[in-house]
């Protein structure tokens, strides 16, 4: 539960940074991969929770 909350906060922060990048206040080539990695981490954590680990 805590990692889900952290990842949602990271998405919100990196989304705001990406908006600043689109306004040319920050480099877009830095903010876009950060947003992508935070979304990727969130989806990985949400999908990997209920996998079958074997007997």
Swiss-Prot record:
Q: Tell me which UniProt keywords the record has, alphabetically.
A: Cell membrane, Membrane, Transmembrane, Transmembrane helix
Q: Which domain of life is it from?
A: Bacteria
Places the protein is found: Cell membrane
Topological type in the membrane: Multi-pass membrane protein
TM stretches of this protein: 5-25, 26-46
Q: What is its main location?
A: membrane
What Gene Ontology cellular component terms go with this record? plasma membrane
Protein's UniProt name: Uncharacterized membrane protein YizD
């Amino acid at each position: 539960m805590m990692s889900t909350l952290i990842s949602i906060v990271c998405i919100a922060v990196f989304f705001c940074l990406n908006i600043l990048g689109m306004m040319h206040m920050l480099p877009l080539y830095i903010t876009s991969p950060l947003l992508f990695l935070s979304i990727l981490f969130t989806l990985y954590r949400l999908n990997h929770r209920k996998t079958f680990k074997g007997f």
